[in-house]
Amino acid sequence: RMAASRLPGKPLADIHGRPMIAHVLDRAREAGIGPLAVACAEEEIAAAARAAGAQTVLVADDVPSGTDRVQRAMKALDPAGEFDVVVNLQGDFPTIRPETLRAVLAPLEDPSVDIGTLVCPIANEAEAHTDSFVKCACAFTGDAMVAPALYFSRLPIPWGEGPRWHH
């Protein structure tokens, strides 16, 4: 979103001469997981995404979350409902590794799993206590790389031993 509170204009932030959204699209293409589209509310972001070779769909900014934006975009992009898996990659994650994007799809091969999301350990204590970061209570066991997400919160999540997770 262009109106991001911590970094206004973030999707167009210049990273080595290209907008952030172009780098995110590069990572998604490198993952090779399927067709790409950028859902956004602002024409400036759409123009940058098109310049980077992406299909775009403008979605009104009255949605409460990125997930809601994706749902609206899919109604326009896939009205027949042909796609049964959608990866919601936020446009402010230019450092995501392509193998991470591929890995998020693995749990969806289990027919009892409807949704997957990535989490990472909270590295900065301040992130655990700010409402600008979504935290996830996960039920990881042992060295498992996949776990049920129990709930998400912008408030601090109480925890015992082990890492706390950022969504």
Predicted regions and their residues:
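N-terminal glycine-rich phosphate-binding loop and ensuing alpha1 helix
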Residues: R1-C40
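Short, high-confidence coil segments that cap the C-terminus of an alpha-helix
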Residues: I33, G81-F83, D110-D114
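Short phosphate-binding loop-to-helix
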Residues: E44-L89, F93-A103
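Conserved core of the sugar-phosphate nucleotidyltransferase
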Residues: I96-H167
